[in-house]
Amino acid sequence: MAFLMCAGPARPQSPLPAQTNQPPAQAGGVSEKGATGNPNKSGQDSTSASKPAGAGEEAASTRKLRLGPLDPSTPPTDVPHDRPIIGLALGGGGALGLSEIGVLQWLEEHHIPVDEIAGTSMGSIVAALYATGHTPEEMQHVLTDESVNSVFRITPPYTALSFRRREDQREVPNAITLGLKHGVSFRNSLLTDSGLNELLDREFLRYNDQTDFNDLPIPFRCQATDLNAAKTVTFARGRLQDAVRASASIPGVFRPFEMNGHEYVDGAVLENLPTPDIQAMRADVILAVSLPLQPVGKGDLDSILGVLNRAFAVAIENNEAQERKLANVVLIPDVSGFSSTDYLNTVPLSKRGYAVAEAHKAELLKYALNDQQWQQYIAHRAARIRGPAGTVLSVKVNAPQTDLKEIAEKRFAPLVGQPVDTKQIDALLAQVRGDGRYDADYTVGYDAEQPDRPILLVTISDKKTGPPFLDVGVNIAAQTGGVTRASVNFILLDQDLGGYGSELRTKVDVGFLTRIESEYYRKLGRTGFFIAPRAGISREPFYIYSGNARLSERLLQQGGTGVDLGWSDGRKQELRAGWQFQNINWTVDTGADTLPTYSGNAQKARMQYTFDSQDRALVPEYGVRVHTDLGYLYAAPNSTSAPQLFTELDSSRTFRKKNIFLLKAEGATMFNRDVAQPFRYTLGGPLRLSASAIDQYRGTDYFVAASGYLRRIRSLPAPLNTSLFLGGTYEIGQMRSPDAPTVSRQDVYFGVIAESPLGVISVGPAIGNGGEHKLVFTIGRLF
């Protein structure tokens, strides 16, 4: 992971001269390094062919900046004239850049002003926060463990998913998603960017999409790498969130930031320390915080990723050595013991930054102001901080489909006339993104006549790689002396087929269970109602037992079709009712038993309800999930018709962060009707009497209940956000049937449970009161 936190190799670049007499060529929005041109009186480069800011992409504000994204900018003019202008350059380095907060704290405590600031990568986030008026103490509250965990996510939170995507994640919790729109393609980043976007939108809400960065409380610049032009660019105006988002787009970790047909990634790829930007802003004194090249550790070069990581770091260091030469004072914090992924160590890393500033005290104090000058500096900076945003003036939505646009407008309409609530906006955007079909973000602008009332521009766009999408995962359940059930699972999804929200979902399982099942989910208007025809075939082995002795292996082959009419709120619940037709073959494959072979058709009328408020598909920490199926089996030859009722309840509750209490209850009844064997329920296996073999007991009426306790013994940091648990369960269950003795069992299970990219991995022994005992191992679903 350390490799992912480093930018790519640097391109050699000559340092700029110490004195510059011409205005620097920096972007309006973005400017290329080395561009030339003389601004005219309006601030527009007379030789520029670029369009005004926002051209090619709709802007939220009604008032536009005169300079376009690639037009040169001028140095700030609202700077001190009675003392040296002090500029600060903050370099990138992943989490190690958090040490820069401590440097800022030391500078403030010793009355050393920062008149201009620039940053790259993590340095751009710290620099932008400081430039907009955040104190070092406030930054530590912004960059908390909670916010870091929300930024570094491999997948969206389970609670942000739509109902159908939650179903998919529960079935294949370890899925790798492939896009099939342009052949087979993986996504272009390890992490999702919604958490990063939400953090930046929240902190920079007051600054709209037409901001001149010279007008911030501290004039600001940040760098990014233009992948199309293979150049470093400097953001000097436009939307502050976009500038920082581009600069912090670690290649391979976050997807590139796209603007006007160009894609931008971490500025550290070509220029990690933005001292040239500070020089171009005409600072008299340049201070720089540069993160050191870490020594090679034991085993660092023993893998491909380790070698790549070191190669990138060496390339960056070579270029950064030249950039340090432009600074009057270079601060290199001692960050030994930390890595570029230690984002949960904001305070300890800040202390390292404070310490390096203290070590350079003699060099820095000559730039300190007296108390009166410092108060004047603070007052001037505070006067440039924008006040809180007023109530929302309007919401505009851009979307690729008319239906989607109208639905989004309806969802966002209640925001008009209300104070801006970024959490509410993020929740609404999550609803748009929750089906996995679209990307969504928003921009804040202002009207020229009502400059204190924000305009929200919501932009919804198609994902580049799909639909269709293909999820691929595995599920394994194994027991000693029992059965190993392993399958590779596929979910093929073609969305908006026949209209917004409609989809064709095909599930394919290969392994112990072989299955192909397709459902066309067709929305009926915008009421939440739907119709869902389906068809499928399956082949699954079942083992027949007498007590604990296995008698035979039978094969259940099914093929059928059906249709449901239902309603869903799209988030937590779904109700459906329908009919299904099945053709069933139930035959002996190996061994011998006394059960009759069955072949024939059957029909079933059914009603299902599902409610899901749990927070995770792996090990839920809170919430409830209830699934109920009420049906009537009929028209089955050589079998009694029977009503059927099945209910499953899962509940989780966390106490003091490390203790999770689980309750699982499951039961079904055919009201003791003597139905044919292939229609009967089964019981046994992990968390369904764990000490018994999988599906060991067969009958018409059963229940099983399990209460469990998990103790979190270790938490893995972002982006994995997973945990390792020790725990156990107590299970009690019973199986009844009209033609066999009732079986009652009690089990205990204890073991290790780990959340992982492969799903839940569990291993542990189970002991039952009937002489049963098993060692249980699972990968994928939690039992």
Which residues are covered by each model-predicted region?
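Patatin-like phospholipase
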Residues: 13-27, 32-120, 128-442, 446-447, ...
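Gram-negative/organellar outer-membrane beta-barrel architecture
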Residues: 423, 428, 435-608, 614, ...
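Flexible glycine-/small-residue-rich
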Residues: 224-226, 236, 333, 397-401, ...
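Sec/Tat signal peptide C-region and signal peptidase I cleavage site
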Residues: 8-12
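Bacterial N-terminal signal peptides
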Residues: 1-6
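C-terminal outer-membrane beta-barrel translocator/porin domains of Gram-negative envelope proteins
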Residues: 434, 440, 455-457, 467-481, ...
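Conserved active-site loop/cleft motifs that coordinate metal ions or position small ligands
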Residues: 288, 330-332, 725-729, 760-766
